[in-house]
């Protein structure tokens, strides 16, 4: 009777779920789209009177600037080419702006024929991103270069690591500006701005530098601010002033997309002695590095300009007085590239070798805490060592997937004594499970006595019932830290494993919906429910393997005392299979392999104590069939 009731309840839940999903896709979805279309049409009609030349109506129905293609935006200025082992692109002579960069060493997808990653793009193009440098006038001073100023350069110049470029501008009022731009073989530009005062009066001006984004992508694979696990937005390390915060440099990370605009659109007057400031994506960084002996004021700001949110990280240096006939120079560095940990560390310590575990023997910082550009998370004390050990294993085997498996073995060995005690306790609990059940039946009307006799039984058998939780509690920060490593470190991006796994930082690309590729069909193309099939129901081979190993691990454990808890535990493998199917496959490989090692360890202990377990049951069944066949 109870089984029939359970079946009826399950059928009701399945039918109710199917009706809700069908109603959402067939009724609510089309109605919502119709309402959105009507709202856009209404906004567009209201905005027609406000549309100016050079403007258009955006997707939300409001007037927005007419966007140029990337090539059209580049064509708005004469340019000097950039060509290094790591970068390609150009510098605009209009504004002397670094605004066109591609990262040669990284592709947009895991496909070998994929184009390189685009970092900077010129103003006028959608989602423009660039770096500006210059001078701000003091007390109403005029005649300084602006973003519209066209600088002059000798023809044929190409910026390479061995050949800096020189730009000049004469304002016709006695000031001659010279900008010398150099670049190394990786990702660091050096911009030296010199002003020569040929006039008859002294002037005062202050150096500044800015990284600016005109709108950010929010949709698609390059969308920003979509997850809480990764910090993306304005970032910097500022401070170093005696008497302020103990003279420490503080990580500035309160300008995250999209909260930056809503919570703190303006964070200015951030006093610092040197430091650095910029903008970060998950993998890419544009950071301004002032002279470390200079006092600066940092600023994070977002403001709407012509219908577009303009995000800016900038600093202004201390004013400099320039007497007649005098010359002043200010130097700023710009990091524009991938956040590879060895590269950031090299810049942080001025190229001096650093052994990661010798924290007591570190060289002096040249760029304070530059490696903080990588979002290590709240368990940094675990996350960073995990990454460092992974790199060591990777250098040994040449595959990050295998390195993850070796890391899992290493962690198991480190935790072996504690885990061994835990699994021994669990094996004993499973062995005395029939006696525990008898005590429950015997004292079912007296819970206090039942608990007392169970504790006495545990004491007699030398069992600690809480020991079974210890391995899981220990693995929680390790799991989170490995998730962080796989998510935020570019070393994991597009790192292949074997077979169909070409990117350990992405979810398993296979799915049971097309029989793991045997049927040449993309579930995402299914009408109405494509997003559902390619989202929550996208379950690959590795998540299924994980679900099986979790089921076997659960079966090896002693049963829960409460029948309801037993049913909940039975559903755990299914729930976690769905959950982990959306996680980075490298994390699923770690958890699956960890389960295999746990099962092996549990089996050895249970076999030692002669405790019945699913593996022995399976072996006995197979042996029984063999005997019958003979």
Curated annotation (Swiss-Prot):
GO terms for cellular component: plasma membrane. Signal peptide: none annotated. It is a multi-pass membrane protein. It is found in: Cell inner membrane. GO terms for biological process: protein insertion into membrane; protein transport. Keywords: Cell inner membrane, Cell membrane, Chaperone, Membrane, Protein transport, Transmembrane, Transmembrane helix, Transport. The chain crosses the membrane at residues 10-30, 396-416, 470-490, 528-548, 571-591. Its main location: membrane. This is Membrane protein insertase YidC.
